[in-house]
């Protein structure tokens, strides 16, 4: 478990204190995939560097597995960092070394295994990330996705308990991003690793995370289970991320609906309710006609969800609203 207890970070620049992270409390459970999302300067990279103690907090405590890592001396920090793997945005591979040697590097530096043990470990890791046939290649011979897989294998080399991902997919195309996220999900599931990833893309959070914290100006402005935050955003920053993911401009959409008659509502379905024939049932029971103005069906990690924007006309409108709520469907009245 990772706990931030009133942690804050301030930098001294030209004689002035510049806050990078305001007092923050946060808990990340063991085995969780936890996402930190925010635009540049939000403070998410600072939080990542605080977790692995590349940065020391200006105040507060960081507790990992019951130990206060803010109080560690140099030797304790060295041992602790061996339990924390790191995946970088731009891969950070050594161009002069082969794939196998890049993966082996943390083990060589640790100096605790024989060459034979290191070679065996590297072979296992390359097989795990699907690069068993690329061991003798150099980074320049690999695609972006393959380079990131090397980075993942290297991060796993010391058998870490925690894996930190710093914008790990932002330099990749959408198809490669999906395959890397699938690999991270498999690693989380099979190795029971705690994964903390930072991103500015809600789609990354939606695909792989269990919980998310939304950051803005050095503060966590909203946090919770991904489905709850994604489907029912409250803070303006969260709403903007959701709209960017859905590629929807709410202002333009409302203008498009300005001349549509009737009441306009947005329904959000989760789980089995996503596929239930609710609209037809409500229309028959209440006499309310509907037209579908916009909609989508997708998944948040393994949970299906659907969103429909409807125009409702005639019949018993209040009964229809009550029926939607009784079916455990979230309803937002837009007009």
Swiss-Prot record:
ATP binds at residues 38-45. It comes from the Bacteria. It is found in: Cell inner membrane. It is an enzyme of class 7 (translocase). Its main location: membrane. Keywords: Amino-acid transport, ATP-binding, Cell inner membrane, Cell membrane, Membrane, Nucleotide-binding, Translocase, Transport. Pfam families: ABC_tran (PF00005), NIL (PF09383). GO terms for molecular function: ABC-type D-methionine transporter activity; ATP binding; ATP hydrolysis activity. InterPro entries: AAA+_ATPase (IPR003593), ABC_transporter-like_ATP-bd (IPR003439), ABC_transporter-like_CS (IPR017871), ACT-like_dom_sf (IPR045865), MetN_ABC (IPR041701), MetN_ABC_transporter-like (IPR050086), NIL_domain (IPR018449), P-loop_NTPase (IPR027417). GO terms for cellular component: plasma membrane. Residues 2-242 form the ABC transporter domain. It catalyses: L-methionine(out) + ATP + H2O = L-methionine(in) + ADP + phosphate + H(+); D-methionine(out) + ATP + H2O = D-methionine(in) + ADP + phosphate + H(+). It is a peripheral membrane protein. The keyword Zinc does not apply. SMART domains: AAA, NIL. Its EC number is 7.4.2.11. Belongs to the ABC transporter superfamily. Methionine importer (TC 3.A.1.24) family. The complex is composed of two ATP-binding proteins (MetN), two transmembrane proteins (MetI) and a solute-binding protein (MetQ). Part of the ABC transporter complex MetNIQ involved in methionine import. Responsible for energy coupling to the transport system. This is Methionine import ATP-binding protein MetN 2.
